[in-house]
Amino acid sequence: MQITFLGTSSGVPTRSRNVSSVALRLPQRAEVWLFDCGEATQHQILRSDVRLSQIRRIFITHMHGDHIFGLMGLLASCGLAGNVSRMDIYGPPGLNKYLEACQRYSQTHFSYPIRVHTVQPGVIYEDEEFTVSCTALHHRVTAFGYRVSEKDRPGRFDVQQAVALGIPSGPLYGQLKRGEQVTLADGRVIHGQQLCAPPELGRKLAYCTDTIYCEGAVELAQDVDVLIHEATFAHQDADMAYQRLHSTSTMAAQVALAAAAKRLFLTHFSPRYAPGNDLQIDNLLEEARAIFAPTELAYDFLTYELPRHLEPERQTLSVG
């Protein structure tokens, strides 16, 4: 699981930051899941290691232009390239009508099926590896945050130890690999976890924008490995944050702290903090770290790989 930030500015692009988009790269299945798709996202993709042909799912947080104005162009380009078999898009009410209107008035024909899912709080997608859920955030329009949870993977089965214990190969191996308890012909009871390496714990990611501090964001981000949270304003500009229902850097840090997240990436910065201004983005980082130390500033094309975690060492089983 790799995160690539394709746009980290709020509202409008700047010389160094495009508007919102984050790519979640899943190399094990040759897929990319996109979160938001602001203007020029496909241009950002061309400048990155993300492959347009691998985009399989797109998750839209809300209907403001800096999060959706790149969507129609990206979908059209995928069709012209001819190497996308299907696209699933998830987002708030109105997203489907928006895309239908764009397609109708531009007379764009998609050569592949597109399915738009109108989301509601709860689980919105699940397969054998991942679960994606969403919850409502607090913004001027309907907005949702997303959480991606990777399922735990069983540890490697120790065939050599199984042979040394005299366990016959066949169906018993399958049961033990699944962690089940089996009874051998001689009466010995073997527990599957005693022959398997520690499971790999599934990794978790939460994406929260646009929103002011809210309990929904805290709930969504519980115990995640990475929280990506908007930080449109500095703490001294909190009045504007409350007026526009955006977060300050300190609000984002408070969400991460309350949720016991492992790492926080700030994004969606107002252009008012660009280099040369009295208050700059580095000041937002200082504010956040005073509350939640493992905080980083996102920037365009930053890539971060979520680390894997193992459960405590398994109990060893002696031979003899």
Swiss-Prot record:
Pfam families: Lactamase_B_2
Domain of life: Bacteria
Cofactor: binding comment: Binds 2 Zn(2+) ions.
Active site: D66 (proton acceptor)
Enzymatic reactions: Endonucleolytic cleavage of RNA, removing extra 3' nucleotides from tRNA precursor, generating 3' termini of tRNAs. A 3'-hydroxy group is left at the tRNA terminus and a 5'-phosphoryl group is left at the trailer molecule
EC number: 3.1.26.11
Coiled coil start-end: none
The keyword Hydrolase belongs to this UniProt entry's keyword annotation: yes
Gene3D superfamilies given in the database record: Ribonuclease Z/Hydroxyacylglutathione hydrolase-like
Entry binding sites for Zn(2+) 1: H62, H64, H139, D210
SUPFAM superfamilies in UniProt: Metallo-hydrolase/oxidoreductase (SSF56281)
Keyword list, A-Z: Endonuclease, Hydrolase, Metal-binding, Nuclease, tRNA processing, Zinc
Cofactor entry: Zn(2+)
Chain's role: Zinc phosphodiesterase, which displays some tRNA 3'-processing endonuclease activity. Probably involved in tRNA maturation, by removing a 3'-trailer from precursor tRNA.
PANTHER family: ZINC PHOSPHODIESTERASE ELAC PROTEIN 1 (PTHR46018:SF2)
Family the entry assigns: Belongs to the RNase Z family.
HAMAP family assigned to the protein according to its UniProt record, in alphabetical order: RNase_Z_BN
Subunit structure: Homodimer.
Protein name listed in UniProt: Ribonuclease Z
